[in-house]
């Protein structure tokens, strides 16, 4: 078994590297065979005694050649919640090649001597580097003030690498990455949370020119909240112009506090033909306001000294702690789908303490889990003629006879599509404290996304969809919304804003061209919720707002 490691040099076609092969005679020796010029040449093999790797990683010359990372001490790994059930440790070899930007090839790749080396040999093969497939590891080099985060999805062969130097973070995608996927969004959120709590903060995004998915996702998340004067790319197309990239990045910087003049100037209503025209969005905040706090705007382009960096780190830690103390994640329950033979069955995770979010007495209630009221409901139909009334019979039967744990119910009560939720799809229910600001609501949504994406990232479905449902609307009618993941924050905040204004949103759901939304126009039905249904003419603002999605 031979592990070949090559490093591509920029603006050069020559490939320099070494091939290390274990000797079958003595496992303590290593055959060293250098090759130059992009093709193998017959050379003399030198048997050298294999050196033991130092504690913390193999600091070979290839690792030391990194232009940014030159630590005086071995890197220290900080454990981060794993994305899968099985725990794996990061291999120093994988860490070295991932941080140095080198390409890893398959072990059984044979390079012909007669043909010229092609680009397919330099492709990053994520199956070789297992250390990034199941966990996210953060390496901090205190001397160089550089932190690196890497993650690879083995199933999608997507490699993400992040580098923080000073107050600049770089997120680079080396293979086909879809930032609309929940586990990729989870990587971004975890990266933000880790950097804001352990390092210096974020003031600018620097992204690879070939991949603009991150830029398109953030542009879509902004939605109608912020409209820059210059056009930005909101699609997943490659961006090659530096001017366009700079304009897009500048559009992400927002003021954290919105005064009345700014709100009045930027809150321009949409035309009547566009979606979401009846919902004001002036106080919904912005995603970039949380990614880029105003405390970093003075240091956006000016370098900071070490004392300034440490002071900023301490101040940012205080802000993060205050935000975490003010917001609490209340209810989280998970519907899981497992494959039993060729059939899929839904498993329910029940606890002794069950209930409903609306039955919580106050905002300081401890976190608990409860059964799902919309456990096996079908997705909304694509035909607009088919409304929510078609679900009444199935929902009423399911509400009267709850399903047992580990089963899908009888065949008579089972819909055509057994599981609305895909495998390991997380459904989170959150409650907002009374009179909570939009910024706090947004931060709470961000926490729930990280929780949901941690389970969704292990899904075996090709493209897991997310179910969005307002908890207040459950008492009147089931209004599921299967939306594209990027519209998540905008739609939920618009819907909550409508609740706070007393708008009957059961028939005024925001619609988008890329979503399938069916407004509920039927009469209220009884559900498994413990609270009584709210009448449609009740326009009072509820004391606690909540949602399940």
UniProtKB/Swiss-Prot annotation:
Residues 50-92, 353-391, 523-542 are annotated as: Disordered. Residues 75-84, 356-369 have a biased composition (Polar residues). Keywords: DNA-binding, Phosphoprotein. It comes from the Viruses. GO terms for molecular function: DNA binding. Residues 523-534 have a biased composition (Low complexity). The tegument is a granular zone surrounding the capsid. This viral structural protein may have important functions, such as protein kinase activity, DNA binding, and possible transcriptional activation of immediate-early genes. This is Tegument protein. It comes from Human cytomegalovirus (HHV-5).
